[in-house]
């Protein structure tokens, strides 16, 4: 069940990054350039199976100037 949740979250992150890129008129190659990464590496990330680190997500948020994640507060509960 945890593996399924991990994959679902990865796809949600990728969807959010795609949404931001589209809204800003950017492509994956632009993101690669902003992050100093190869287009191939960004392409692998965007397949939805990459295990994003917090540092990577922060770098992407900074490069795009838009939030990717929303941290759930204490009063909110996570579905089990």
Language model: regions and residue ranges:
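N-terminal flexible/basic segments that precede or flank functional cores
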Residues: 1-19, 24
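Residues that mark the N-terminal boundary/hinge immediately upstream of a DNA-recognition element
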Residues: 16, 27, 38, 53-56
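The alpha-helix within a helix-turn-helix
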Residues: 21, 32, 61
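Short alpha-helical DNA-recognition segment
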Residues: 25-43
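DNA major-groove recognition helix of helix-turn-helix/homeodomain DNA-binding modules
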Residues: 55-70
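Short, charged recognition helix plus adjacent turn
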Residues: 72-80
